[in-house]
Amino acid sequence: MTTTNFEEYDDPILYDKENDAYLLEIPLLLKWAAEKQGPIIDLACGTGRVTIPLAKNGLEMIGVDLHRGMLNEARNKSELLGLPIEWIEQDCTKLSLVTKSNLIYSVGNSFQHFLTNKAQDELLTSVNNHLELGGVFIFDTRFPSVEELLQPANEEYWKSYTDLEPQQTVDVFTISNYDSLDQVQHYTTIRKYKNENGQIINEKRTNIRLRYVFPKEMERLLHAHGFEILHLYKDWEETPITNDSYEMVYVCKKMREHSA
């Protein structure tokens, strides 16, 4: 993940408004946390959307992210709640933590922010280096279906929500363009803010690039970095993967040491 792909995360408050209610990962992570002792590492933790709920369950948490603004917001939230979470500003591809863990996870499809083969290799090497032998790595990434990759290149409606501060309706649209050679989707997100009369009073655009990995490609990638795939699901409810999946949730076990 690089600081040149951060536009979508430049406003941590907006990120929380749009994503804080999503907590589907928690049950599966709690299930695996119950089997593992010691601190748990949340890679690309953002504002602590998942880190904080797990800490509320009494787990020892370490959150790592490269984005200082997101990390500061996470720290502010955990301090208000009196939660002793360790927040660390580091690049996940160059991890240098004093702690090794039996459970590392990354949620929110953060794996897709590692755009090149080199970045993916460095990330998985970092994870391997900070996992105990037999430790578990859990992460998700969007499924590269035809529908997902061939989204229209024109402006398309996605969703609407209400921003309570101030009281505004926000209509969200997307434009996407898939680069088949690099397996990278270029997204533009357009947020149109409306007043109580339905008039558009503001518009914001952000850009982001996301790398897609195919299942067989991921299988070989994980094996090459010392991991065995224990489970592959289509969602966080542990539903078996199918051809019409929207995402892939991997539960992997470290089988051997790996160095770059």
Question: Which functions belong to the PLM regions below?
Answer:
Residues S96-L103:
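A short acidic, Gly/Pro-enriched loop at the edge of an enzyme's catalytic core
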Residues T141-K216:
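SAM-dependent methyltransferase
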Residues T51-K94:
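Class I SAM-dependent methyltransferase SAM/SAH-binding core
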Residues D121-L133:
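A short glycine-rich, Lys/Arg-flanked "PGG" loop and its adjoining helix->strand segment in the class I
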Residues A44-G48:
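Class I SAM-dependent methyltransferase "Motif I" SAM/SAH-binding loop
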Residues G134-T141:
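Conserved beta-strand signature within the Rossmann-like core of class I S-adenosyl-L-methionine
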Residues R209-A260:
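C-terminal lobe and adjacent flexible extensions of AdoMet/dcAdoMet transferase-like proteins
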Residues M1-G38:
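Conserved class I S-adenosyl-L-methionine
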